[in-house]
Amino acid sequence: MKIAIIGAGAWGTAIAMLLARNNYRVTLYTRHSAHTQEINQLHTNKKYLPNIILPNIIKATSNFSDIVDHEIIIIVTPSDQVRATIENLKQHSISNNAIIGIASKGLDHNQSKLLSDVVKDYLANNPLFIIAGPNLANEVAQGLPCALTIAAIQKEVQFNISTLFHSTNVITSTTEDIITIQVASAFKNIIAIIAGIIIAKQYGQNCKASIITQGIKEIVAFARAAGSTNPDISQFGVIGDLILTSYAITSRNTKFGYDLGQHEYYTNLINNTNPNLIEGIKAAKILYPLTVKQNLNCHIIDCAYSILHNGSKISYAIECMLKKINHETK
């Protein structure tokens, strides 16, 4: 079986290692020839996974044509690059039998769509799955125990993809709910930013746990509005991913939130921030108008948007959010 992964960052490489440990040959696509040479000759990916040696059966390429005949193609690019990647696959006339996987986090930046809907726009006949879980890429690469959720409408795809990853160290779960898992992947980074601010501003762990609980409510509300009839939040790729992202201080979004909480305005930190690495910044900009349009009470999204994109004072925005949540629960 020929498996390709588009995106040789930390998470893409970690996914490749999971498959390689189960003796599947994987082709990693990266745009940079120097990156390709490092992976193929040194079996390392030092920029993203320092001190990790890659299995020899992982091969890299910078030639997109090398991967278009693969039976399974997993996209692990930043969310703002997914549409262009799908367009590229379409232009290369990949087989209708090729199974497309999405491991990217977030929403489409052009049309504010779920990434699965972008795939359907271009590759409507191809089977599709979403993969997510509470996983730090470095721990996965080290071979530590981890868990994954495989979301796919077709039961056969759920089973086949789950089987590829399952091992004594990898727990897998499956669900038909491809909507909630994608909504959670977009919301979790925003919730993590606010959770980081909460700790930096010394509101305490109780408050942080309450915010995460509120975040789950907002994920469910948005997932229903997006078409999920019964949001499946119990999955590793939903509540598990949210908990890890919000509590791991090594999480980029949580750390960014903590750093942000040392100040009163985002502008105090903006020159030291790469918004391309902090998915929650972009996600808040996309999600806020969608929640307003759907008339949803997503107070965490409102708070994040006001801080990151509307210049609000951080302490004031947090207090307003807490008051709204308190009022709503009465």
Curated annotation (Swiss-Prot):
Its main location: cytoplasm. Keywords: Cytoplasm, Lipid biosynthesis, Lipid metabolism, NAD, NADP, Nucleotide-binding, Oxidoreductase, Phospholipid biosynthesis, Phospholipid metabolism. GO terms for molecular function: glycerol-3-phosphate dehydrogenase [NAD(P)+] activity; NAD binding. The keyword Nuclease does not apply. It catalyses: sn-glycerol 3-phosphate + NAD(+) = dihydroxyacetone phosphate + NADH + H(+); sn-glycerol 3-phosphate + NADP(+) = dihydroxyacetone phosphate + NADPH + H(+). GO terms for biological process: carbohydrate metabolic process; glycerol-3-phosphate biosynthetic process; glycerol-3-phosphate catabolic process; glycerophospholipid metabolic process; phospholipid biosynthetic process. This is Glycerol-3-phosphate dehydrogenase [NAD(P)+]. It comes from Orientia tsutsugamushi (strain Boryong). The gene is gpsA.
